[in-house]
A protein has these predicted regions:
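Cytosolic catalytic domains that perform sulfur/thiol-centered chemistry
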Residues: 1-161
Length: 161
């Protein structure tokens, strides 16, 4: 039987692998305007050690009138490489809600051919509740090479729905 949880990792697993050279961590937090929260500012103030911030409001298809549409592959590739993510890295994504925008970014990685990507079970709220380490340190990441290719078979358009 296939492991149905292969796309989710526990907080204890991530804590054990924080220093692993092939692990990259991304905070993909995003909030609805009525929530009056600033995801990037919250990241700057407190995040999982080694994490980078992915801004879904900036890395999108700017030609579309709809919010958060998939960015062109070149934009996604460039943005992810600047976060220090390259071929051979396992990416762990979390958000400040638990599992809302993290699932969206997980899907974006899959669309662009990056399959070694997982979501942190319970996200940052669970990490905090368990008193795991946090930091305000912002580390510059070395730009890496990342091979991307689009897999539109997992994208639905209006006709598909």
């Amino acid at each position: 039987m296939e492991n149905v949880f292969k796309n989710i990792v526990s907080t204890s697993w991530l804590e054990e692998h924080l220093e692993a050279p092939d692990i990259r961590i991304i905070d993909s937090s995003w909030y609805f305007p009525h929530e009056k929260r600033n995801a990037e500012q919250e990241f700057i103030e407190c995040h999982i050690p080694g994490a980078s911030f992915f801004d879904i409001d900036k890395i999108k298809d700017s030609e579309s009138d709809l919010p958060h549409m998939l960015p062109p592959s070149e934009m996604f590739n460039s943005s992810i490489r600047k976060l220090g993510i390259g071929d051979g890295h396992k990416v762990v994504i979390y958000d400040g809600f638990g599992m809302r925008s993290a699932a969206r970014l997980w899907w974006m990685f899959r669309v662009f051919g990056c399959s070694d990507v997982v979501v942190l079970d319970g996200g940052f709220p669970k990490w905090i509740k368990e008193n795991r380490s946090t930091t305000a340190d912002l580390n510059e990441k070395e730009i890496r090479h990342l091979t991307v290719f689009e897999d539109r078979s997992i994208v639905a358009d209006r006709d598909d729905v």
